[in-house]
Regions:
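Alpha-helix termini
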Residues: 29-31, 55-61, 95-99, 128-145
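Short, glycine/charge-rich flexible loops or terminal/linker lids adjacent to PRPP-binding catalytic cores
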Residues: 59-108, 114-125
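A structural signal for isolated positions on well-ordered beta-strands in alpha/beta enzyme cores
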Residues: 36-38, 67, 108, 149-153
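Short glycine-rich phosphate-binding loop at a beta-alpha junction
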Residues: 31-41
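Short, highly selective alpha-helical patches that border small-molecule cofactor pockets
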Residues: 20, 44-48, 52, 120
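Active-site-facing substrate-recognition patch
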Residues: 1-33
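PRPP-dependent phosphoribosyltransferase catalytic core
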Residues: 2-3, 125-210
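Generic structural signal for small/hydrophobic residues in well-ordered secondary structure
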Residues: 16, 51, 109-112, 185
Length: 210
């Protein structure tokens, strides 16, 4: 077998499952969400489903709800401004009347990786805008109590300068910080056994170079 490696980072399903489980302990302690959103081309579906298992209430057996939004990001130009960045994010799936179900909730936005943070910025900003529209339909005395809180969880956070930003009052959780290199997830490949083999090879080569 050739020892050639493409330099990509990889993790197996089991490793990601375990990583999410450890992160769930922090999320439950510090945020305790009761609603989850997955987004960005489906990358958050698997993490959100695993996270729901770990956040399931031990006594009531109540699961957090999961709804999906989809975002696609075009390649950004070096001269991109914040407004232009937002315009480059395209909605492929979004909430409609379901937005009102967020009122009064602690929402957790879930994705696989925080790369440029552009899509995370867009998701938080646009969901907050939609929620504010729903709040205007309520009596003013009820709005503060019904305003939802938003948090973010990503499996991996790339250590790099971010183009996007998140509000200071939005809790942010990551399973693991990683270098700014391409990361291959097992749900993106057809041959998961080859994926796992390459993941193991990468670890061996990294150990040799350490």
């Amino acid at each position: 077998m050739s020892e050639q490696h493409d330099g990509h980072l990889r993790a197996t399903y089991n490793e990601i499952h375990t990583l999410i489980g450890k992160a769930a302990e922090r999320i439950e302690k510090e945020y305790a969400p009761d609603f989850a959103h997955t987004f960005v081309g489906g990358g958050g579906f698997f993490p959100a489903r695993v996270l729901r298992t770990f956040l399931k209430h031990p006594e009531s057996k109540r699961n957090i709800s999961i709804q999906a939004i989809g975002l696609s990001l075009y390649e950004e130009l070096p001269s991109t401004t914040e407004e232009q960045m937002a315009n480059e994010v395209v909605r492929t799936q979004w909430l409609g009347p379901e937005t009102k179900t967020l009122l009064g909730r602690k929402v957790l936005i879930v994705d696989e990786v925080d790369d440029s943070r552009t899509t995370l910025q867009y998701a938080v900003r646009e969901l907050q805008k939609d929620v504010e529209k729903e709040l205007l339909l309520l009596p003013e005395s009820e709005r503060d109590a019904k305003r939802p809180k938003f948090g973010v969880f990503v499996v991996h956070n790339k250590l790099k300068p971010k183009r996007g930003t998140l509000p200071a009052d939005v809790p942010y959780f990551s399973g693991e910080d990683i270098p700014d290199v391409w990361f291959d997830y097992p749900w993106e490949v057809k041959d998961v056994y080859e994926h796992d083999r390459m993941a193991e090879l990468g670890r061996k080569l990294q150990a040799k170079s350490a």
